[in-house]
Amino acid sequence: MLSRLFKAGEKVLSNLVSKKDIYMASRNQEKSPKVQELYDLCKETFTGKAPSPASMAIQKLCSVLDSVSPADVGLEEVSQDDDRGYGVSGVSRFNRVGRWAQPITFLDIHECDTFTMCIFCFPTSSVIPLHDHPEMAVFSKILYGSLHVKAYDWVEPPCIITQDKGVPGSLPARLAKLVSDKVITPQSEIPALYPKTGGNLHCFTALTPCAVLDILSPPYKESVGRSCSYYMDYPFSTFALENGMKKVDEGKEDEYAWLVQIDTPDDLHMRPGSYTGPTIRV
């Protein structure tokens, strides 16, 4: 009798252990939110210095970033018939047309000493002017919409014009090479820029309502020299090369521009918003 009770008890205990194992296994198999996976990868990858573009970790990060959808970060795609507010449109400073567009909304997902995760929500025609990312790497995912990107890298060694009477008040001007001048969508390859390659200086113009998920490493930090500077671009023909400067190949002048640092543009209108996606476990 006792032996049968012991055997029955062992069977019940075995069933309980089996069910617990199944439950724990199912819990372990549950996928973390995509934004959590992205955060965990950023935490593993970034050490405080701009990463190498050839690293396997960066390739993995870009792969995960590319899979993020608006719903993964608490967004819904905005109708193309969005309201208009203050702003300008056009991809060139010489042919932009005055137009009303709402302010750009900035959503802060996470920021620490080594990286920033954030979202920019653009109404149609809104613009983030040409700006830089000193000693930083930036990875961007277009979540929805169409965005025009124009990007430059500095010509090395530096080619700087310090005197020119033709354009008063616009100097010094530094030569940069055009890296990108195109429209990107959610189907586009992840734009990745680095301190000296990939288009470290870029400007955005929203052709439709759109949202961009950005990862920056390391973050902007003025106290250590990583402050955001804005620029105006001028055609290569605006200034004459000074003696001793490296010549630009004939017929390729359109691939270069002179960049002049300016104050933060008055028409840059940005407002903070609330991130409503999954909470990140830090």
From Swiss-Prot:
Cite the entry's keywords alphabetically. Answer: Cytoplasm, Iron, Metal-binding, Nucleus, Oxidoreductase
Q: Which reaction does it catalyse?
A: L-cysteine + O2 = 3-sulfino-L-alanine + H(+)
**Cysteine-cysteine disulfides:** none
The EC code for this enzyme is 1.13.11.20
pH dependence text? Optimum pH is 8.5 with CGGAIISDFIPPPR peptide as substrate.
Primary localization: nucleus
Q: So where does Fe cation get bound?
A: 131, 133, 202
Q: Which Pfam families match?
A: PCO_ADO (PF07847)
Question: Is Iron one of the keywords UniProt gives this record?
Answer: yes
Required cofactor names: Fe(2+)
Where located?
Nucleus; Cytoplasm
Read off the Gene3D superfamilies from this record.
Jelly Rolls
Which Gene Ontology cellular-component terms appear in the entry? cytoplasm; nucleus
Q: What class of enzyme is it?
A: oxidoreductase
Task: Name the GO terms of the biological process aspect.
Answer: cellular response to hypoxia; detection of hypoxia; peptidyl-cysteine oxidation
UniProt keyword tRNA-binding, yes or no: no
Q: Which GO terms of the molecular function aspect are on file?
A: cysteine dioxygenase activity; iron ion binding
User: How does the cofactor attach, per the note?
Assistant: Binds 1 Fe(2+) cation per subunit.
Record's family? Answer: Belongs to the cysteine dioxygenase family.
What does the protein in this record do? Catalyzes the oxidation of N-terminal cysteine residues (N-Cys), thus preparing the protein for N-end rule pathway-mediated proteasomal degradation, upstream of the N-end rule enzymes ATE1, ATE2 and PRT6. Controls the preparation of the group VII ethylene response factor (ERF-VII) proteins for degradation via the 26S proteasome N-end rule pathway. Acts as an oxygen sensor that controls the stability of ERF-VII proteins, which are stabilized in flooding-induced hypoxia, and regulate transcriptional adaptation to these adverse conditions.
The protein here is known as Plant cysteine oxidase 3
